[in-house]
């Protein structure tokens, strides 16, 4: 490819978006920012636009768009401001775009990510919900469009690096026995079970290793994040749920492992910094400097592993059940979790009630086949309705 790659960053003001911009800025001859999108931190989006001079910016509604357009003009920029989901899809699929960082959190990221896939882009997938909600439809679109799908979650990027290039032939065909997803265990890995009832949002968001947004920090604490990653791994690598094992590894130095039938286990190691998988995906199949410090094994000293405790992490069990059920179950799991986590962060429910809401939603609604995107969003809406009804009956 001649000239720099033009990059759209969906979710530019989040932690993944900011890390992407850090890597991009290190290689101005290789990458050029084409579009930036933001949702609520619009002052930060303005500052990023001034720094990176994209051709487009996208915000959620018209009032914010007019203000941002005026502020950009005052700064001497001719960046064009677009609005809403239509704007997101436009900058994701734009003919001038080479690569799209899909980093919008939650179900809101599905349509623009799918737009990038259908346009045949190189898609750097940080929005795991896109695959969780609509895995079969999403992967079918990848195959039909010829899009290049590169995982950004550190675990899936690690697996991608440890698998042979022809893994699409099937894990069995390339000699893979199982995939092992590592997890830090979050802030409550050793908290006495009786104390979990009184966990606060601030405690749940204080991750011991990674710096993340509030929603994903809670998901990490409950290990729902790992459950969603299990479902994502099944779609990315055409694995059965029983081929994906979760291992708690508190140091977060080994990002995941691949176990082969000959007894070999390949692992990818690195300091816990999202710039590593971002740089790997941006440059693939080449390599570029990410700005991450070299790994110092002498300083780390030891690596520990343990099996997840199902009583401590019921969300992981629920996610595995949804993966095994298939159909509408993963979309409903994700939607119920989004509602429950938002309620917990707002102080409306207790920490341990997150899993209870999700389990009730999954138990109340039968699993149905997902034959199109409308069915995905119908399952999502139904789960949100049921979770909302639970909150009306039970919130404190």
Curated annotation (Swiss-Prot):
Pfam families assigned to the protein according to its UniProt record, in alphabetical order: DXP_redisom_C (PF08436), DXP_reductoisom (PF02670), DXPR_C (PF13288)
Q: Where, by residue number, does Mn(2+) bind? A: 153, 155, 229
Chain positions recorded as NADPH binding sites: 13-16, 127, 129, 213
Q: Which UniProt keywords apply?
A: Isoprene biosynthesis, Manganese, Metal-binding, NADP, Oxidoreductase
Does the record carry Zinc as a key word? no
UniProt EC number: 1.1.1.267
One example of a Gene Ontology biological process annotation? isopentenyl diphosphate biosynthetic process, methylerythritol 4-phosphate pathway involved in terpenoid biosynthetic process
Reactions mediated catalytically: 2-C-methyl-D-erythritol 4-phosphate + NADP(+) = 1-deoxy-D-xylulose 5-phosphate + NADPH + H(+)
- GO MF, one example: NADPH binding
Q: Entry's NCBIfam families?
A: Dxr, PRK05447.1-1, PRK12464.1
Q: Which HAMAP family match?
A: DXP_reductoisom (MF_00183)
Q: Please report which protein family the annotation says this sequence is part of.
A: Belongs to the DXR family.
Q: What is this protein called?
A: 1-deoxy-D-xylulose 5-phosphate reductoisomerase
Instruction: List the lineage, top down.
Output: Bacteria, Pseudomonadati, Pseudomonadota, Gammaproteobacteria, Pseudomonadales
């Amino acid at each position: 490819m001649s000239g720099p790659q033009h990059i759209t960053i969906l979710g530019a003001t989040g932690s993944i978006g900011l890390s992407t911009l850090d890597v991009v800025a290190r290689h101005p001859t290789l990458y050029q920012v084409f579009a930036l999108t933001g949702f609520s931190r619009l002052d930060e989006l303005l500052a990023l636009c001034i720094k990176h001079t994209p051709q487009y910016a996208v915000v959620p509604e018209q009032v914010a768009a007019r203000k941002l357009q005026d502020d950009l003009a005052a700064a001497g920029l001719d960046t064009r401001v677009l609005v809403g989901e239509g704007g997101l899809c436009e900058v994701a699929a734009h003919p001038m775009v080479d690569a799209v960082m899909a980093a919008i959190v939650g179900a809101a990221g599905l349509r623009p990510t799918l737009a990038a896939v259908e346009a045949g882009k190189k898609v750097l997938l940080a929005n795991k919900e896109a695959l969780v909600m609509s895995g079969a439809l999403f992967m079918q679109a990848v195959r039909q469009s010829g899009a290049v799908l590169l995982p950004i979650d550190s675990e899936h990027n690690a697996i991608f690096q440890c698998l042979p290039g022809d893994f699409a032939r099937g894990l069995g065909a390339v000699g893979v026995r199982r995939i092992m997803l590592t997890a830090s265990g979050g802030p409550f890995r050793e908290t006495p079970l009786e104390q979990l009832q009184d966990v606060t949002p601030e405690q749940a968001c204080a991750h011991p290793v990674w710096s993340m947004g509030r929603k994903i920090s809670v998901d990490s604490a409950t290990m729902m994040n790992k459950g969603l990653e299990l479902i994502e791994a099944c779609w990315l690598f055409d694995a059965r749920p029983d081929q994906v094992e979760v291992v708690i590894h508190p140091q977060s130095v080994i990002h995941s492992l691949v176990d082969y039938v000959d007894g070999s286990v390949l692992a990818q190691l690195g300091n816990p910094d999202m710039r590593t998988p971002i740089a790997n995906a941006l440059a693939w199949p080449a390599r570029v400097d990410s700005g991450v410090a070299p790994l110092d094994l002498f300083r780390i000293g030891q690596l520990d592993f343990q099996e997840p405790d199902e009583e401590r992490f019921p969300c992981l069990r629920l996610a595995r059940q949804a993966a095994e059920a298939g159909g509408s179950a993963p979309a409903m799991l994700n939607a119920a979790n989004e509602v429950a986590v938002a309620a917990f962060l707002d102080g409306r429910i207790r920490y341990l009630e997150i899993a209870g809401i999700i389990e009730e939603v999954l138990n109340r609604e039968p699993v149905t086949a997902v034959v199109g995107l409308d069915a995905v969003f119908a399952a999502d809406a139904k789960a949100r309705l049921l979770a909302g009804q639970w909150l009306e009956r039970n919130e404190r």
